[in-house]
From Swiss-Prot:
Organism of origin: Hevea brasiliensis
Origin: domain of life: Eukaryota
Signal peptide start-end: none
Physiological role: Binds to actin and affects the structure of the cytoskeleton. At high concentrations, profilin prevents the polymerization of actin, whereas it enhances it at low concentrations. By binding to PIP2, it inhibits the formation of IP3 and DG.
Protein name from the UniProt record: Profilin-1
SMART domains per the UniProt record, alphabetical: PROF (SM00392)
Cytoplasm recorded as keyword: yes
Taxonomic placement: Eukaryota, Viridiplantae, Streptophyta, Embryophyta, Tracheophyta
The family this protein is said to belong to: Belongs to the profilin family.
Keywords annotated in UniProt: Actin-binding, Allergen, Cytoplasm, Cytoskeleton
Length: 131
């Protein structure tokens, strides 16, 4: 299965009538493996900052998580595994695997829990596959 297929079928899938706004699988070095057509153009520094928070949880809390120029308030995640951010009625979930970051961006009517489930389910699967 190609990385683009994972994005199209596993991340941009329908859940209770809702879809993520955008999604991507990005290498820990910031290289794009696959992304939805509307995934925001991000800066390498933004991915570096996200990776730093996985290495040292809490580093993003004071400044927020920035992705594609959008600032998200960091909310409770799982240290070293998941970072969650919120902005107004939407937000972002980032799941770290051995080699990649799985990123899902959502907006209402999708709920944070639905986004978390989609992103973390794929992340867990890839970890089980040694990715």
């Amino acid at each position: 299965m190609s990385w683009q297929t994972y994005v199209d079928e596993r991340l941009m899938c329908e859940i209770e009538g809702n879809h993520l706004t955008a999604a991507a699988i990005i290498g820990q070095d910031g290289s794009v493996w696959a992304q939805s057509s509307n995934f925001p153009q991000f800066k390498s520094e933004e991915i570096t900052a996200i990776m730093s928070d996985f290495d040292e949880p809490g580093t993003l809390a004071p400044t927020g998580l920035h992705l594609g120029g959008t600032k998200y308030m960091v909310i409770q995640g799982e240290a070293g595994a998941v970072i969650r951010g919120k902005k107004g009625p939407g937000g972002v979930t980032v799941r770290k695997t051995n080699q990649a970051l799985i990123i899902g961006i959502y907006d209402e009517p999708m709920t944070p829990g639905q986004c978390n489930m989609i992103v973390e389910r794929l992340g867990d699967y890839l970890l089980e596959q040694g990715m």
